[in-house]
Amino acid sequence: MDIIGGQHLRQMWDDLADVYGHKTALICESSGGVVNRYSYLELNQEINRTANLFYTLGIRKGDKVALHLDNCPEFIFCWFGLAKIGAIMVPINARLLREESAWILQNSQACLLVTSAQFYPMYQQIQQEDATQLRHICLTDVALPADDGVSSFTQLKNQQPATLCYAPPLSTDDTAEILFTSGTTSRPKGVVITHYNLRFAGYYSAWQCALRDDDVYLTVMPAFHIDCQCTAAMAAFSAGATFVLVEKYSARAFWGQVQKYRATITECIPMMIRTLMVQPPSANDRQHRLREVMFYLNLSEQEKDAFCERFGVRLLTSYGMTETIVGIIGDRPGDKRRWPSIGRAGFCYEAEIRDDHNRPLPAGEIGEICIKGVPGKTIFKEYFLNPKATAKVLEADGWLHTGDTGYCDEEGFFYFVDRRCNMIKRGGENVSCVELENIIATHPKIQDIVVVGIKDSIRDEAIKAFVVVNEGETLSEEEFFRFCEQNMAKFKVPSYLEIRKDLPRNCSGKIIRKNLK
């Protein structure tokens, strides 16, 4: 089923500007409180100016341009400006350091970088020490270093006309983006995303949360992440709604921002929910217009109920990953919800549970969650220059192996168990890290928790828990292990405990387990 009809991203923005004109399209709030607003007409003009800027710097169709930026208007300008001229965006996680950033530059073949002054010294070092194709850097800040090969993005953009000067032929099959996975367990892989992928994501995610043009979708998720791009931004723009992009998440500021912009939709990850819950209760906790809170794994039922009761919201579950582009399993609009189910397969997708021999399993049996879509349309096209890795997860007929374990009930509701790589083998038993984390998270003194397996010469693996306790609290080993023994089977009780001030996380809030093993 083709719901795009040949409409690539350049056509999308020209149409949006014509249809919605002076309606507010984008609001960006910086960490310093600076707010920038753009109508659909103004945003399309900024996108055109940015496209013209790239053209004057020699960027042509098929060229790759890296973005190393925090949430800001320039990210949106570059994303769609590149798409308008057929070039390819390569967003880089703004938290990455020199080695990881250099690796992505090398493997993406990016020839130009847009970044800010705070990251410039790192890229100056990369240019001097690493073999990349990078030939020019644009800085979004006003002040510039006196170096060759560095330009002011804003000054160059503002010199450009508001109409597009270079419009090569485009197809919805053209690559729009190479988005490198978070790499929590290994080197990141470049997920190839087409114009069709992004257009479909917009329509699909708008359907998922029943978006209308009078909605306001607020997100604090990083713009270089698939959730911000495909679940939030593309959904809001495709529906003609208003998209609010906050530079960085603050638990203290979040509800004030929701109220200030009269947001009707937002998205949360477990880390956000837990930090919001430890804020002092306020009479304004329920003073908002939120209709849905898009939610991504994983949360205990006790935490979910407490959050919904305190803030007067409901969670709309959505399950996906970079390779699926959108939440391909989730709560459907108007459908019943069945916690802790992650929902049912969305339109244009099939989902089933398979065993280790790639055979479908009946309802109730645990296996790998597999998704069927159309590569380059409803799921990613491939891993960039990595056919071996592509073949490992993507079958020729469109079945994608997620690497997640779960099961399905008789009514088609799916249940997430854990990442396969997060299952601990302990004396012949399979133990789910997520299951243990959900139990331990209910301890009133614990703010954050992760469980990992460590080598054990006798029982294959031992279980180690890393916890962060609430501010002002203390937790003894005796108290911790007693709680575990009272709430889980004996073979699941952790053998080791380490109390930390924080846990290592990537840009989407996922804990980087490899840093703890």
Curated annotation (Swiss-Prot):
PROSITE patterns: AMP_BINDING
Catalytic reaction equation(s): 4-(trimethylamino)butanoate + ATP + CoA = 4-(trimethylamino)butanoyl-CoA + AMP + diphosphate; crotonobetaine + ATP + CoA = crotonobetainyl-CoA + AMP + diphosphate; (R)-carnitine + ATP + CoA = (R)-carnitinyl-CoA + AMP + diphosphate
Keywords for the protein's UniProt record, in alphabetical order: Ligase
Ligase found in the keyword field: yes
Xref: InterPro entries: AMP-bd_C (IPR025110), AMP-bd_C_sf (IPR045851), AMP-binding_CS (IPR020845), AMP-dep_synth/lig_dom (IPR000873), ANL_N_sf (IPR042099), CaiC (IPR023456)
Described function: Catalyzes the transfer of CoA to carnitine, generating the initial carnitinyl-CoA needed for the CaiB reaction cycle. Also has activity toward crotonobetaine and gamma-butyrobetaine.
Name of this protein: Crotonobetaine/carnitine--CoA ligase
